[in-house]
């Protein structure tokens, strides 16, 4: 198995976060109550901010990324049951947390670790809020 470079890891995260924006926007449009709308607006804001942070991080590294979007949004929106969509969204947020942890374990400098940690924290918060909503 080939070891991914830090740049490749961050590009992959950015592609996933772009898909997260699309998924959150779609879920926001389908929200049926104010609590769900507030939750999806929170997630959407977090995904947008993550895209901005990752984009700036890549620029600091001397690259711009791929411009591609992951397929996660399609998977989320293909589900018919709202709770299943939200559970998959949680899994996607957990995936991002794992990938950030893996990227940090490669030993980058604080100029990379700090923005990744900020994204991780936001995802941890959103995971908790989504789980609370499902209860």
Regions found by a protein language model. Give the residues of each.
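A generic hydrophobic-segment detector
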Residues: 103-135
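Alpha-helical scaffold segments that form or flank carboxylate-/histidine-based iron centers
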Residues: 4-13, 32-52, 80-86, 111-124
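Alpha-helical bundle segments that constitute or directly flank the non-heme di-iron/ferroxidase center
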Residues: 1-31, 83-107, 121
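Carboxylate-rich helix-loop segments that flank metal/cofactor sites and access channels
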Residues: 52-98
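Alpha-helix boundary/capping and short turn/kink residues
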Residues: 33, 63, 106-110
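Conserved alpha-helical segments that form or flank metal/cofactor-binding pockets of metalloenzymes
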Residues: 37-69, 126-135
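Long, non-catalytic architectural segments outside compact domain cores
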Residues: 12, 19, 23-26, 42, ...
């Amino acid at each position: 198995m080939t070891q991914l470079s830090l740049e490749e890891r961050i590009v992959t995260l950015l592609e996933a976060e772009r898909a997260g924006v699309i998924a959150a926007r779609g879920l926001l449009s389908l929200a049926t109550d104010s609590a769900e709308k507030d939750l999806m607006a929170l997630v959407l804001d977090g995904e947008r901010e993550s895209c901005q942070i990752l984009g700036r991080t890549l620029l600091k590294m001397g690259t711009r990324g791929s411009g591609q979007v992951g397929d996660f949004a399609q998977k989320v929106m293909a589900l018919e049951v709202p709770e299943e969509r939200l559970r998959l969204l949680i899994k996607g947020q957990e995936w991002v947390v794992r990938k950030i942890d893996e990227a940090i374990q490669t030993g980058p400098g604080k100029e990379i670790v700090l923005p990744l940690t900020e994204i991780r924290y936001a995802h941890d918060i959103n995971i908790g809020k989504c789980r609370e909503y499902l209860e």
